[in-house]
Amino acid sequence: LYNLRKREGQDKVDSVHFSSIDTYLETSKRLLETPDPFVIFCEPDLEAPLRAIRGDRPTIFRDIKFEHLPFWDKLPRIVENNKTSPVVWVSPEKFTDLYYLIINHKVEFMRQVADLNTFNTEWFAWVDMRIVLPESGLANLSQWWDPERTNVAMMGLIDRNRPKDRYTFFRNNHGWVAGGFFAGKRAAILDFTTTVIREWKRTLDEGYSPSDETMF
């Protein structure tokens, strides 16, 4: 939510990429009021309003300041990579260097949750809060995940021709799938997240700064 908070209250910001924190909280109630166990990763000052919505439902909060992110040390590399192999800045206010660092942490967060398995469950799903916004165009999808699948399930986003080279692909903000949702059984999730983290670090070393969607 960093970029949304940064731009909140400022004029001339498109609603497709930016919404107020109040809008996020209001539109996410339907999701947050489900009885399923949640592990919520957020900035420290967002725990209170999120906890108020969750009530006594099983919930673990992971409050993390940016400088305490596991891969915070990768930010200088991302900054440098975007100078030499820049991505397409669809919305410059949102797609910043810090954004590319934060958005690629979701697989590490998911890996930690699946590894610890505090709620002793076989199934895991990552959901971006932004998915519940009407502007995302994804809010009304209902058949995201078939629980009987053994592989990781994700949402198809766009059908595009295969790029001619690696840089042509990684310079895009969007890939073939939406990065806001992925789900699966514990073993598949652990394999998927571990692989994405490894490949993301390798891609950074190659001089690119991919988004979560292009990594997926």
Q: What is each stretch, according to the model?
A:
Residues L1, F38-V39:
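Hydrophobic targeting segments
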Residues I21-P37, A52-R57:
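Short, acidic, metal-binding catalytic loop of nucleotide-sugar glycosyltransferases
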Residues G55-N120:
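Active-site-proximal specificity loops/subdomain of glycosyltransferases
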